[in-house]
Amino acid sequence: MYEDCVKSTEDYYLFCDNEGPWAIVLESLAVIGIVVTILLLLAFLFLMRKVQDCSQWNVLPTQFLFLLAVLGLFGLTFAFIIQLNHQTAPVRYFLFGVLFAICFSCLLAHASNLVKLVRGRVSFCWTTILFIAIGVSLLQTIIAIEYVTLIMTRGLMFEHMTPYQLNVDFVCLLIYVLFLMALTFFVSKATFCGPCENWKQHGRLIFATVLVSIIIWVVWISMLLRGNPQLQRQPHWDDAVICIGLVTNAWVFLLIYIIPELSILYRSCRQECPTQGNVCQVPVYQRSFRMDTQEPTRARDSDGAQEDVALTAYGTPIQLQSADPSREYLIPSATLSPQQDAGL
């Protein structure tokens, strides 16, 4: 059965290999992940129309980009199930680092915004958060393009490289992604410090996601560079190790970060207005500073005029209702009693 499968499918024999079922299991998990990710994308599009808090809405475009990158990770699984050739090799070396760089850049941008929100400050606008995510991941895209271009133009095809050289180059291309992981880990820890407790739950989700991702990456890189050669399983286990790490990390993104974020977003959409007593407590030093300057709860609108603002349950400034100048308000005039009139 195994020989017939290899002869009939060549590079695609893992799709019908019954002796090594790792490929069948991983492709099944990848297909399920693709379906779940598409459903989550539709759910995000539906909830984006119902979110009223600007601080919550500003991060939604970045999370939508994050989901698109996760969808790409599940699709990339099939490039590792198919044997390494002149078509799958550039796809592997380019998309693996770029897609993970986009994911961790989105987490970094979200964590950077949370650092402000947990301290009661105003959120970045959605374009700023999105540009941070795209800009930070751009360097990994440039690195991957240069590497693939050099390999293809010099005539040194991937198929002619030794397995150890392929693995070393693959890991070296991911150094910037490892840096993004470490940076996101420390920035997410900074979200634990601040008076606004409601925003800290988002920071804890990012922290847990990055922590589990770091563990996954340490395991599969160690197995790829040290474990497989010592067990004399190189190159037979190389694709399986990378593919397992890829699918596992993609599911971690969904289960630890996206699905909890979606549930928090759904609960906040059901609350029409923030409850009293759940207001973000401003630190003492900020209150004393505002009392000294005699400008409590003042902000500027788009025209530059100062207006009264208040903080919602998430610490988001909202404008207080003011009187409509176009409407007439009648104030009753004061009248004197008969005794006071006689005295006059």
Swiss-Prot record:
Bilayer disposition of the protein? Multi-pass membrane protein
Which is one Gene Ontology cellular component term of this protein? plasma membrane
Where it sits in the cell: the answer is: Cell membrane
Does the keyword Ribosomal protein feature in the UniProt annotation?
no
* Highest taxon of source: Eukaryota
Tell me how this protein assembles: Homodimer.
What is the protein name stated in its UniProt record?
G-protein coupled receptor family C group 5 member D
Which organism's genome codes for this protein? Answer: Mus musculus (Mouse)
